[in-house]
Amino acid sequence: MRRTKILLVFPPVGDPTRPYLSLPQTKAVLAARGFLDVCQRDYNLRSYLYYLDRGRLERTLEHVIARLGMLDRLASLDAAQSAEYAELAKASLVLPFVTRNIGGALSVLRDPVQCAIPERYLAAMSVFERALQAVSAEYFPTQWYSFAFRMRFSPESPEQILAALEAERDNPFLEFYREAVLPELAGVPFDVIRIVVAYQNQIIPALTLAKLIRKASPGIHLNLGGVTTSYHVKRLAQWPELASFIDSMTIDAPIPFEGECGGDLAFAELLERMEAGAHGCFLVNPSAEVDSLAYQPPPDFDGLPLDQYLSPVLVLPYATSRGCHWGRCAFCFHTGKYVERAADAVVSDLATLSAKYHTRYFYFADDAVSPEMLARVSERLAGARLNILWHCMIRPEAGITAELARSMAAAGCRSAFVGVESANRRVLKLMKKGTTPEILAQVLRNLHAAGIAVRVFCMIGLPTETREEAGDTLRFLLAEREAIQDVRCQIFRVEKDTEMARRPQKFGIRTINDDPNRPLAYELETETEGGMSRDEIRAFQKHFERSCNEAFHRWNRQATFFGFSHSSHSLFRSCHAEQHSHSQTAVGQGLALRRAP
């Protein structure tokens, strides 16, 4: 057994309904390399529970009232103060109600019986959202939503990040870390702490924690990893101030993913070098390109608070592959090497995890599971009779046949997230999507006919896309509404490290601007040769959303956990909520909330 004591950390803000894959996966890889003294902490979930505690919400009300009083004493308010006053006033009105009911709301979100009743679920969801809005008012203009976090400081700018790390009035995680995390860490002599940054909005919370740990325990080696770290690694390495509180970065092979592909090996190699007496270097790459996932044991979720996630059932993330088997879309940077796990190993892992953690529910976190892998895994799952239920993400391609969809359903697939992007033939070809409107329609129908809930993602405002072409996508979705459970749509922006960014003229992009003041931005500012203007795109998106809201059932539209289609609640609803979706027995009952007199 190796002697290094290690802590793996997932910082705010992410999905509070399930664990994130990278930590359990890294823990398992480290154990296989002899590092057994490894703890893992989900500070993302902990931060939600800290601020949504009844006692903390009572303090929020005190802070809100005090701030309102201070603003009231001013002779006049400027525009920013007026906006803050409005948010504080709303929070002061809602907080007594929210404080009384937050415990019941969290209980509903963890209860499979209550959560399956739409009215009670939506009532609990409303309390949760309003509680976060009230906390946001306390830290105005910071906005904390489920799975989203925004400050007046941009995570795309190193200078603004540094300012955010000490902004007491803006950064809620300073209090959370000082009150709930640092005292806990002080009692355990960790040698190395690895902070996994998966999403852009985690950069400020992650580095806030790193800086506080550096000040409190300067002898701890602080490592930064995860997908976002890997994506930005060259730019982060050019940021000298980062080295004052981060000792090393261990990055993935060029395969962006929820788990890690090579980053876990690189971290193990760093630990081995440190035990051999070498000083940790600032940047560590995988020593070799990852050609197989055979080196990865099943993820180890031990030590995570699996009963505290805000989900009616425990949904565990798992990956059958890394990367995208297509890897040619011009708008996407997921073009690295694609590697798969052997289907027999997948089934063996799922059987182990299901038995060990007493759950039937799994979220396949692959970027997109290939039709061939779906066929192999479905066949073996059915043969093994594991009786598990799962969600996956797929490309709408010809390989998703009616036969394959039936096989997937028989093996427990209950929900699929489908990246439609556009339903216009020219735009699909321009994007190198590798599909057609006819194939899109057939895939959706095949999945629906097999009993698999279909969730669609699309984009508006692709380079040179006209309003008529964007309308083709909307008309397509409305025509296929019987096969679609819900739709998510966002405005398209060109991202760095994509073919569109490298060869803009090919896609009708006239100018492209990589703002030097935003080196950590994913997106680029562009102007196109034709298509809709930004104002026209925003106007069409509003029209798109109104049309979809009218077309899809209210329960289908709203019952995905705060609009995040990958969540545990989506899979649960697909498995169990159908019998309740038209029930009127609970109408008006809601959460049995205690209303203000």
Give residue spans per PLM region.
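C-terminal non-catalytic accessory extensions
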Residues: H566-P597
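Short acidic/polar active-site loop segments enriched in Thr and Asp
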Residues: L36, D191, T359-R360, R414, ...
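Flexible loop/turn segments at secondary-structure boundaries
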Residues: G14-T17, S47-Y48, Q200-I204, S230-H232, ...
